[in-house]
């Protein structure tokens, strides 16, 4: 069954074409990842499919029996309404019953609770209410009577995600789910739960995400928007990389062939008289096609860049018996650690356990309650925070980067200009003269990252650097960090990114306890799951023994 049929879709942003004449079908059961650089039309394509934007040309047909549900990066709410009212603003009796029940339980009014229970029973809503409870619990959504306007950015995203999941669980059989970066603002446990949830829900899915493990878990086909075209690849992310590399190799060979032909045809064109025969006119038309092919550029995001890092001395950072609390929240309880040269440490823990506070304490931004943080004299921190790009006045991208430095020194003794450095990180010459206010969220994140790297730090502290970055930018950043000789302290919900870059983990277990685990995130999760399985089996054996003992006592 075709859920969606698209023919000849074209859309531009101002004078910039996003995609031109693309066609595709989405069929029942498809699970598709849509990837591309920021600013080339991923979110726009989703909005066209949902009917929130119109194409300039082409058709988009949704099957009449298909119910479309969309999760957007910028959630829309009734701001003065409560979380409950926003979650359940549906007209169906079952949704109303659940909404009334949740509000009654929050109010603790016995009459309201009794009436809401009767309404739940009349509408057979208990099974669905149980599913709703699971969604809210797993996404850490509490205080349902709080106005949405009081929520933080991360809380808003989680409420929006919960609303989306409630909708797909409630809607009839044929559901098409469109999701735009659903893992942003989720911790690692939430992401793993969401993977399992989407696998269980038999929905047809079109997903935009930079989280490669998430893509591999919930999709089986990758579409890429590139140079105004849409390319499709069956299989997982690794297969996509292989197939794309083969395609680019073929395209480069084709361009080289066109360049050779172009040189010959250019010589012929110069020798031709102005009056053309029909045959020469045809050859002339073909010349312009060959010229366009020969001048085509294929982007290569492979980065080889050895920075001239600020020298690291023998002493890095020493933490001695560090304590920090905020009221009842204990962030650090006697933390001791001596950092070594070239260490790459990943930080793992639930939202709200104090990971960002820990990073601030190491840099001296926040003071501990007791204990000492001794930082080596040669340490130059480069801190990527979640606060985003900070600028006092609007200016062009290249002007902004030059306020930090004019040149980027290389280990070879040379240097890169600000323009060259920007281009390495996928800011084209045209984009370099764009005003900061006109950049997308992902482009601002990328520029924020560049300003930190441009300062030549020898100790990088990266707090969720992958949020809002596209996959091509992530590939460039990963390669840069793999070649980086300094220390790296990384907080990220991107497990692929973490696995590729870190040597060991600081596990924030809560109540101020930090455990040092010698391995990457995937290895840690495998160990944790094996412990849980062992504990479960041991519990079952213990229960069986107790039951057997009881039977022996009862049976004469």
What residues fall within each predicted segment?
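A short, surface-exposed helix-loop junction/capping segment
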Residues: 109-119, 263-271, 300
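Proline-centered turn/helix-capping motifs that create local helix->coil transitions or kinks
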Residues: 277-279, 289-299, 393, 532-540
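ABC ATP-binding cassette signature C-motif
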Residues: 1-255, 305-556
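Intracellular alpha-helical coupling/juxtamembrane segments of multi-pass membrane proteins
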Residues: 243-276, 280-284, 290-297
């Amino acid at each position: 069954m075709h859920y969606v049929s698209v023919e000849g879709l074209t859309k531009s942003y101002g004078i910039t074409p996003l995609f031109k004449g693309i066609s595709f079908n989405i069929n029942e059961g498809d699970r598709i990842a849509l990837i591309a650089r920021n600013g080339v039309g991923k979110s726009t394509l989703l909005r066209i499919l949902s009917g929130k934007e119109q194409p300039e040309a082409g058709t988009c047909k949704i099957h009449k029996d298909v119910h479309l549900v969309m999760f957007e990066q910028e959630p829309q709410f009734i701001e003065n309404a409560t979380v409950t009212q926003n979650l359940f603003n549906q007209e169906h009796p079952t949704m109303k019953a659940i909404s009334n029940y949740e509000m009654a339980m929050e109010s603790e009014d016995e009459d309201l609770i009794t009436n809401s229970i009767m309404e739940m029973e009349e509408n057979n809503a208990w099974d669905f209410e149980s599913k709703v409870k699971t969604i809210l619990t797993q996404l850490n959504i509490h205080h349902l009577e709080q106005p949405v306007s009081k929520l933080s950015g991360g809380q808003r995203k989680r409420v929006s995600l919960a609303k989306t999941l409630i909708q797909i669980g409630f809607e009839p059989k044929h559901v098409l789910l469109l999701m735009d970066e659903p893992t942003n603002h989720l911790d690692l446990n939430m992401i793993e739960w969401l993977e399992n949830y989407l696998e269980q829900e038999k929905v047809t899915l079109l997903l935009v995400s930079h989280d490669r493990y998430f893509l591999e878990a919930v999709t089986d086909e990758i579409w890429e928007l590139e140079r105004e075209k849409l390319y499709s690849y069956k299989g997982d992310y690794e297969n996509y990389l292989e197939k794309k590399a083969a395609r680019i190799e073929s395209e480069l060979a084709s361009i080289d062939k066109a360049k050779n032909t172009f040189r010959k045809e250019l010589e012929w064109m110069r020798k031709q008289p102005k009056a053309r025969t029909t045959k020469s006119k045809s050859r002339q038309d073909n010349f312009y096609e060959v010229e366009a092919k020969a001048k085509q550029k294929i982007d290569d995001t492979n980065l080889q860049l050895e920075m001239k890092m600020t020298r690291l001395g023998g002493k890095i950072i020493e933490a001695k018996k560090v304590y920090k609390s905020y009221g009842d929240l204990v962030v650090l309880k006697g933390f001791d650690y001596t950092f070594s040269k070239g260490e790459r440490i990943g930080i793992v823990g639930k939202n709200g356990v104090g990971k960002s506070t820990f990073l601030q304490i190491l840099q001296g931004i926040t003071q501990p309650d007791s204990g000492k943080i001794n930082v080596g004299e040669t340490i130059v921190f480069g801190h990527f925070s979640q606060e985003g790009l900070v600028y006092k006045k609007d200016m062009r991208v290249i002007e902004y980067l030059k306020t930090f430095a004019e040149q980027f020194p290389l280990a070879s003794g040379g240097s890169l200009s600000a323009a060259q450095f920007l281009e390495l990180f996928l800011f084209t010459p045209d984009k370099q003269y764009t005003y900061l206010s006109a950049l997308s969220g992902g482009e601002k994140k990328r520029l924020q990252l560049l300003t930190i790297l441009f300062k030549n730090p020898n100790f990088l502290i990266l707090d969720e650097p992958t949020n809002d970055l596209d996959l091509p930018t992530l590939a460039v950043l990963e390669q840069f960090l793999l070649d980086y000789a300094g220390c790296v302290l990384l907080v990220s919900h991107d497990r692929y990114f973490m696995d590729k870059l870190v040597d060991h983990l600081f596990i924030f277990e809560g109540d101020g306890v930090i455990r040092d685990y010698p391995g990457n995130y995937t290895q840690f999760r495998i160990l944790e799951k094996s412990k849980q399985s062992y504990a479960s089996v041991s519990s079952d054996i213990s229960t069986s023994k107790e039951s057997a003992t009881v039977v022996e006592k009862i049976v004469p």
